[in-house]
Amino acid sequence: GAAYAVVEACSKVVAAGADYEKMRFSYQEYFERMTDRKSWGKPLSALLGALKMQVEFGLPSIGGKDSMSGTFENINVPPMLMAFGITTVDAEQVISPELKFEGNKLYLVKHTPLANYMPDVDQLKANWNYVTEQIKEQNIVSAYALGFGGIAEAICKMSFGNGLDAKINVDEKELFNYGYGSILVEVEGELDYPNAILVGEVTDGEESELTINGVKFDIFDLMAANSAKFAQVYPDTAEAY
C-alpha cells in the first residue's frame, strides 16, 4: 500500500503539469501503538515499500512525521502512510483537472501493475514523461490522477468544474478499479502512444449529464452525492439571517 502512496503522489504532480523527476517527498505515517511483532511489522513493511519506490524512482523524502500512538483502549487507527509530493514548475505549464472544451477527446494513460501487483516502475516513468511532454506541447489541457474511485471518480470530478458533459465507454470492471499510476487526460488533438487508450469525449454541456457506457447521470446529482458525506461536518451552504 505504501508503495502506491508514493506512486499516487507522483501521478498527482504529473497531472498538474510538473516533472516528476524533480519532485521530493514528505511522509506522514500513522499506526497503532506498537506492542508486538505483528504491530511492529506494519510500519516496517510500509516504510520498506515506500523506500523501494524512492530507490527505483531515484527520488528522496526530505521530511515527514510519524505517529505511533493511534490506539484508544481497544480501537486502533487503520495503518497508513501518506505521501506528499512537491516540486516547482513554470506557472504557464500548470493545468487543472476540470474539463475545458467541447469536442476534446478523453484518453486513459494506463498503468498496468506487475504480476505481483507491485507498480511497474519502468512503465510509470515512460507514461509520466509522455504526459509531461504532451502538457508542455499544450495538447493535454486537463488531467486527473486516478485514485481509489478509478475512472468513474475521475470523470465525475473532471466534469464538476465547468459543468461540461462527457461520454465515456470503458469495461465495467475498469470503472471502479483503483488505477493508481494511471491518468485520465483531456486532449485537443490525438495521442499516439501505446499506453494511451481512447475512452470518450467532451460534449456540449447543455444537458449537464455524464454518459457512462450509455447510462446518463445528472452532473448536479453527482456533485450532491460527492459532497453529502461530509456536508454536516463541513457545510458548503448556510441559511441567510
Q: Where do the model's predicted regions map?
A:
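A glycine-rich phosphate/pyrophosphate-binding beta-strand-loop-alpha-helix module
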Residues: G1-D66, G70
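Catalytic core of tubulin tyrosine ligase-like
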Residues: V185
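A structural-propensity feature for long, helix-poor, extended segments
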Residues: G179-G181
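Intein/HINT protein-splicing elements and their conserved insertion hotspots or analogous self-processing inserts
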Residues: P43-S45, P60, D66-N177, E188-Y241
